[in-house]
């Protein structure tokens, strides 16, 4: 009798069983959707044959809305109700975005993420992004002829937990099942790696409309391993537009604050066209009339533009150096540099990348499309449509360390930065005081040694710990980061089994430069941080020793004569005074002096306990 053959899950070859999944590049300036068709990834066009969907949503008074090209065409005439570059606001609070360069919107002060007032009511960045995602979903279903089982949506590698969660929420609102949030540079590497069968060390330089990412990847026989990631979640092509915008106004003697919102949007649109023209011409002309009758006519050379944006170009190289340092490689070790994002079409970017890495960048895939193509490949795999050439493994990383606060305001790192995800790490902690029945778990993110210098992500409490002496309880704290880069934390007391957990969902994310600043500060202040940590550890141990000694004196002080008691009291007082200073060595010495001075007392207490335990018992009972 022949054995029945059962396919591995997801390996069924029948074409009618193929599950439809797409990759979506939710961009700051433009968004795209791609799918694998006939084993080849391709970007899906709209009815007019356009693959790029401008990431623009216009809200109308009657509750209607315009999305994409139609909305973009009206941005200059109705700027307050036409939301552009909404990705910059994802996971951000009002205080973080109110200074957004030349933004014509009325921001609303609401709990958590920023809100924008429109004629159709107050809208959140999640709602605006959902409109864009829903449009792409509809395009995909119309093109592919069926409903989608899910989507892989790309995000900047440097998006923090709040920004990632906001992206998932937008997808859910758009009716999309998120198979995975995939880092944009990694998606690009998938597209390049599978297309070219590449191996070796690669850098992915991703400059989009609103974000910058630099990832170092190692490609080896189908394994995509991210060695390090860096970036700036508030740097992109929009900033180059604003630099040129400010220059044009300065030349005309105008102030942006005095312009009507529609003039700001009109001028930004014209400046963007000017910037794009300078990518292929030595100079370009600007000719525009504002609503107040002011006429601006200027000619800008490429050299002038290059000078204006040089500080922005250098800002991309700072995280590039950090990522190389984290990966422990040099520019000479890099086999190829992949350019991603429409902003990398600028000659100033390509020249800077070529100069830094000592080689021309790879540009054989469209930088606007490469991320969506890689996401489509990953989506097809996650949907179960595996083929013979799909035996590859993706290993992504987290950009910043995750830790927990311990006594004295110290940070104990649980998962270090650039750890491969998904990942789970656990560590055991204990109680500080006798009879302690609860423990506060404070989850932090950053590279510094003190909690005050790191970003607070979440707090929760583990209650119901059985009363025990200090140090007897065993609390196991587990950090778990899923494949989307989202964090969950679990705490469990090992003896009783009592447990608590939290899914980290901060109300909004890190400020524009916080992540880069965290890393930069950690490098600059490493020695100072370690000294501060040593001091706090010494102070915590001194406090523990004082409390333990005082508890022992209260319980068994009669075991000491007056001279012995006075000596111990003197050492306790000395330690308490010294512990208030900033000399860790002196504190450790005073702590040791108290420990040495109470050795005999501890021995007498032990004898007393043994005698009490044996009192009234026969020898054969022992």
Swiss-Prot record:
The keyword Zinc does not apply. Keywords: ATP-binding, Chaperone, Nucleotide-binding. SUPFAM superfamilies: Actin-like ATPase domain (SSF53067), Heat shock protein 70kD (HSP70), C-terminal subdomain (SSF100934), Heat shock protein 70kD (HSP70), peptide-binding domain (SSF100920). One of its GO terms (molecular function) is ATP binding. The keyword Magnesium does not apply. PROSITE patterns: HSP70_1, HSP70_2, HSP70_3. InterPro entries: ATPase_NBD, Heat_shock_70_CS, HscA_NBD, HSP70_C_sf, HSP70_peptide-bd_sf, Hsp_70_fam, ISC_FeS_clus_asmbl_HscA. GO terms for biological process: iron-sulfur cluster assembly. Chaperone involved in the maturation of iron-sulfur cluster-containing proteins. Has a low intrinsic ATPase activity which is markedly stimulated by HscB. Belongs to the heat shock protein 70 family. This is Chaperone protein HscA homolog.
